[in-house]
């Protein structure tokens, strides 16, 4: 890599199933990985020798299912006892354990049992995306804009920001995926001077968002947003997998539920069938020797696939209705409906959406896999002052808080301070008081959600306001100040008005929230793993070089024509050096240095022997 640091910031779409990275240097470029693919699987695999990330990890998943981790985005910022985590754990081949209420992934790596938080796994994927960008730019990358589903809550946003920090990136901004896609659309095929309402329908591998934006010139104002952080292509694959499992059991009497390798192979076949059915109406699924020597073969029509996922497909219209209702806009006022995310390629999803908008033609002009990273790169260029073109110079992004924020009051009532769809950044205030005479401490539990009963919302954390002057109940004036930054992350302050006493917290004991010490420790660990990866690669390279050199010299020594030209003494010296080199290859775990020394030693003897012929 050339010296120097990239002055801009890369845009990373950190996806559930695939990730994508883009950079802006006078224009946006989506960067391909070393395999030439413009999207990289969000997979990390651990083996006795090394760690693999991206395509290499996904390609060996069937051989190493228990130590191949994916779907980290479905764990990040969630509690272990979260209903969706418990449901997902039944389908994942890797092990998830409970550590202080947080889900942690347990794997075998370098012949030891290791545990990683979802943030650390996501950080490994982010590091990979950073390296892909560095290989193209030729400079060190330090800054990034990372995208998250619009419907991610505070804990999920903070955990994603922490993942960025662990990967060694300065995360300038966390932006919402549909908003990033809207930028890509507004600067690309959807370029227009007229004011319009645009609905972004973003259905990816694991998450689903709908955002309604008003675009006027370079000002993008999000009017409302809704979604489901646990709906996407993975769920359609799971339904297909269950169907195929039942079919295999019916035909053979064999149940593959507990065989991680068979499940992985069948899931891969299900995913392939799903993709194929977007362009044809029937496909055949074949998996040789799936389980107990029995082959699996099945014919699947598009109609059957649609039937298996009918309820999920239909559920995608609920957030569409919600955003229209929240923005107080009728569907006839929507000028464009833009498709984003790989799962919007499914014909039935497109038909349901088009029918909902009375046969409206859907906008398919932007690449559904790349639009989010594109928008993030534009935002990165704006934040680092690298955007020079007129169209990006005046671009302004006004996003919203996806869920209401507030405090728990007496009787578990939810007191909303920041209503959902409030434009961020924002500061909102609300006054409270004491419930008992002479009460000197009030606890403020902070929640996020839309339910009246606090217990049905997400607890983000709690704090105490102490040393309140003794007064009759209802007299003290306590003000809660909620500050939401441009990343959608919350800071809360409470003040007792008569004394000015305040308690200021950035929610500390929230789920999935890492302390700065924990982040620092994980950053150091990430560096160690990276160093171990590099050492392994060097060793592998040194071994390959030595093996191929040994093979070529062995050929020389055994070739009667070539060996006859060597003096007898020289030949025996080469054979002795060859034997030393072979011994180095036989050592159980030789270092790259030992292998290099063996190669240099052999080369020295051979060069000397050849020159004295």
Swiss-Prot record:
PROSITE patterns: HSP70_1 (PS00297), HSP70_2 (PS00329), HSP70_3 (PS01036). It comes from the Eukaryota. One of its GO terms (biological process) is 'de novo' cotranslational protein folding. It is an enzyme of class 3 (hydrolase). One of its GO terms (cellular component) is cytoplasm. ATP binds at residues 16-18, 73, 205-207, 271-278, 342. The modification N-acetylalanine is found at residue 2. Changing residue 73 to A: Unable to hydrolyze ATP and moderately reduces ribosome binding. Its EC number is 3.6.4.10. This is Ribosome-associated molecular chaperone SSB1. It comes from Saccharomyces cerevisiae (strain ATCC 204508 / S288c).
């Amino acid at each position: 890599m050339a010296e120097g640091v990239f002055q801009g910031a890369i845009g990373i779409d950190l996806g559930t199933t695939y990730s994508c990275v883009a950079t802006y240097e006078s224009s946006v470029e989506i960067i391909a990985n070393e395999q030439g693919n413009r999207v990289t699987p969000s997979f990390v695999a651990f083996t006795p020798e090394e760690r693999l990330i991206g395509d290499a990890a996904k390609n060996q998943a069937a051989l190493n299912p228990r130590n191949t981790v994916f779907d980290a985005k479905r764990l990040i910022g969630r509690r272990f006892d979260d209903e969706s985590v418990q449901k997902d754990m039944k389908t994942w081949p890797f092990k998830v354990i409970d550590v202080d209420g947080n889900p942690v992934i347990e794997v075998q790596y370098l012949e030891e049992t290791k545990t990683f938080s979802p943030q650390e796994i996501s950080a490994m994927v982010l590091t990979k995306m950073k390296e892909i960008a560095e290989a193209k730019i030729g400079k060190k990358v330090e800054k990034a804009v990372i995208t998250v589903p619009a419907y991610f809550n505070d804990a999920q946003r903070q955990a994603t920001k922490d993942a960025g920090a662990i990967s060694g990136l300065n995360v300038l901004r966390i932006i919402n995926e549909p908003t990033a896609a809207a930028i890509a659309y507004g600067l690309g095929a959807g370029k227009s001077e007229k004011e319009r309402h645009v609905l972004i329908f973003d259905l990816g591998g694991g998450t689903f968002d709908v955002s309604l934006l008003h675009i006027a010139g370079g000002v993008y104002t999000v009017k409302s947003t809704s979604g489901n952080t646990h709906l996407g292509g993975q769920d359609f694959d799971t339904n297909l997998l269950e169907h195929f499992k039942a079919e295999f059991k019916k035909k053979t009497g064999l149940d593959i539920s507990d065989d991680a390798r068979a499940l992985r192979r069948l899931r891969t076949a299900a995913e392939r069938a799903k993709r194929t059915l977007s362009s044809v109406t029937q496909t055949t699924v074949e998996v040789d020797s799936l389980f107990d020597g029995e082959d699996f073969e099945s014919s699947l029509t598009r109609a059957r696939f649609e039937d298996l996922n009918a309820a999920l497909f239909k559920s995608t219209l609920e957030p569409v209705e919600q955003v229209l209702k929240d923005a107080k806009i009728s569907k006839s006022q929507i000028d464009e409906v833009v498709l984003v995310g790989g799962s919007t390629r499914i014909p039935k999803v497109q038909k349901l959406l088009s029918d909902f908008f009375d046969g409206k033609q859907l906008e398919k002009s932007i690449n559904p896999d790349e639009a989010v990273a594109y928008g993030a790169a534009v935002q990165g260029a704006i934040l680092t002052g690298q955007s020079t073109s007129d169209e990006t110079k005046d671009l302004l992004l006004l996003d919203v808080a996806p869920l209401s924020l507030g405090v728990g009051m007496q009787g578990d009532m939810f007191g909303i301070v920041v209503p959902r769809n409030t434009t961020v950044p924002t500061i909102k205030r609300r006054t409270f008081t004491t419930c008992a005479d002479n009460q000197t401490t009030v606890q403020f539990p902070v929640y996020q959600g839309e339910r009246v009963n606090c217990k049905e919302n997400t607890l983000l954390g709690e704090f105490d306001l102490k040393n309140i002057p003794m007064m009759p109940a209802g007299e003290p004036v306590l003000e809660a100040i909620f500050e939401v930054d441009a990343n959608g992350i919350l800071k809360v302050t409470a003040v007792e008005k008569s004394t000015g006493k305040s308690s200021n917290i950035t929610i500390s004991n929230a789920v999935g929230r890492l302390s700065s010490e924990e982040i620092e420790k994980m950053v150091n660990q990430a560096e160690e793993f990276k160093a171990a990866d590099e050492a392994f690669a060097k060793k592998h390279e040194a071994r390959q070089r030595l093996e191929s050199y040994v093979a070529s010299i062995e050929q020389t020594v055994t070739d009667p024509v070539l060996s006859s030209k060597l003096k007898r003494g020289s030949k025996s010296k080469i054979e002795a050096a060859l034997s030393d080199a072979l011994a180095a290859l036989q050592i159980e775990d030789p270092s790259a240095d030992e292998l290099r020394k063996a190669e240099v030693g052999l080369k020295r003897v051979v060069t000397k022997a050849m020159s004295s012929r």
